[in-house]
């Protein structure tokens, strides 16, 4: 059963009256089969997030990906840390000259493509030898979140990375990928100062370098948490004539109203994601580039706190259906975070059903 069919079935079951309840008398239902239809693209199953890049080499990761692919016609997977030192992309020799190694990158992306999905490339994080400082994020895998010490070397890395992908997979293939610059630079995933201006500098270098490799490569940002920085980002790329092929940002039902909307308004948890999407959609429409697609590259349903593990329950299906209904027409892609619980932001998963983000629990158990 496809995801869309499953959602429809869930809605139909939910709409059935409880046995014994007062039911209205049956009556005719008229449907105008000649009425003008409206397209309903499956924006919610085009992309999924996952645990960080290196985990894509695991057999359990790939098996879970294949299982989800059977029921959801998703085309892209997005994950953090393709430039983490554990992937081995960047080093420097004794003279300080860059040394590149794309062996693990090839194995990671080959594994996705062999299973019928493409990378939604998140360009992160900073290789230690390229970092201005050794600022690390508190995730278990301790990624470096500082700016580069030398933008010439950063540009060289991005150019070599993109050129290698084009050489290996061909421009007709890689032109169908997306390249998103960094992850949530407005919070503790980026320690540049001033925070926004320094991120824009990183974005400008990265976007222009990608386009120098081939103008068909698609790049975007600002990849922020809580739907932030979109208007300043759009103003910046327009004013400075920086390439941007899409807008990306994140928003979760568990994000606070203050963070999402900068207001004290009382907004229910189950309305926050699509209200935030509507806000960003309007910001794009008001910008100098109103036709840019909106990629919501992280979201999930309310967790209701760690003690309830709501994301391990059948509640998720109904919550997803409600979000799809609310968000229709406002967004091009929503990338659910994540497709499975092969995921180690807080350490190695000890047991299934521990409240993880994924649709498949540890051990390949379908939620």
Where do the language-model regions lie?
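Sec/Tat signal peptide C-region and signal peptidase I cleavage site
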Residues: 18-20
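N-terminal carbohydrate-binding accessory modules
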Residues: 22-75, 208
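Short, acidic/polar
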Residues: 34, 55-69, 228-237, 314-324
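Conserved residues at the C-terminal ends of beta-strands
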Residues: 50, 80, 182, 250, ...
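Glycoside hydrolase catalytic-domain groove-lining segments
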Residues: 64, 254-307, 323, 332-341
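Aromatic/acidic polysaccharide-binding cleft in carbohydrate-active enzymes
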Residues: 296-367
